[in-house]
């Protein structure tokens, strides 16, 4: 799992240990962001059920102004924090440990 494009391109993202999740593949992520690319730069992003934070981090890497990450799971919340720091986007991120539903 990595950041596909932007300022954090190539940054490896840590998975949530012990969780049987299937992260969004790089190909799917790239296709999604190709569709919305005209709306990302300067945007305020909300990454609900953030998991690893990869979608919000990708948006920040591609020029989003800010991202609020929402994750209830304690282990995943910790991984989002680590991944945000590793991608060097901490100044544009707020991470909330709460239910999104």
Language-model segment annotations:
Residues 1-101:
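Class I S-adenosyl-L-methionine-dependent methyltransferase catalytic core
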């Amino acid at each position: 799992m990595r950041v596909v494009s932007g300022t954090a391109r190539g940054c490896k993202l840590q998975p949530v240990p012990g969780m049987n999740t299937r992260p969004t593949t790089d190909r799917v992520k790239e296709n999604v962001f190709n569709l919305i690319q005209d709306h990302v730069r300067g945007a305020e992003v909300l990454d609900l059920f953030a998991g690893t934070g990869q979608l919000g981090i990708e948006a920040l890497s591609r020029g989003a102004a800010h991202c609020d990450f929402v994750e209830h799971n304690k282990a995943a919340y910790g991984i989002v924090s680590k991944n945000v720091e590793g991608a060097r986007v901490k100044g544009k991120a707020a991470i909330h440990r709460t239910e999104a539903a």
